[in-house]
Amino acid sequence: ECCNPACGRHYSCGK
């Protein structure tokens, strides 16, 4: 999980 917009397409906060 990544809650940082820098993760780009890997962004998945709470999913």
UniProtKB/Swiss-Prot annotation:
Q: What is the lineage of its organism?
A: Eukaryota, Metazoa, Spiralia, Lophotrochozoa, Mollusca
Query: What name appears for this protein in its UniProt entry?
Result: Alpha-conotoxin GIA
Location in the cell:
Secreted
**Its domain of life?**
Eukaryota
Q: Which PROSITE patterns match?
A: ALPHA_CONOTOXIN
Q: Which family does it belong to?
A: Belongs to the conotoxin A superfamily.
Job of this protein: Alpha-conotoxins act on postsynaptic membranes, they bind to the nicotinic acetylcholine receptors (nAChR) and thus inhibit them.
For this chain, the annotated S-S bridges are C2-C7, C3-C13
The record, for InterPro entries, names:
Conotoxin_a-typ_CS
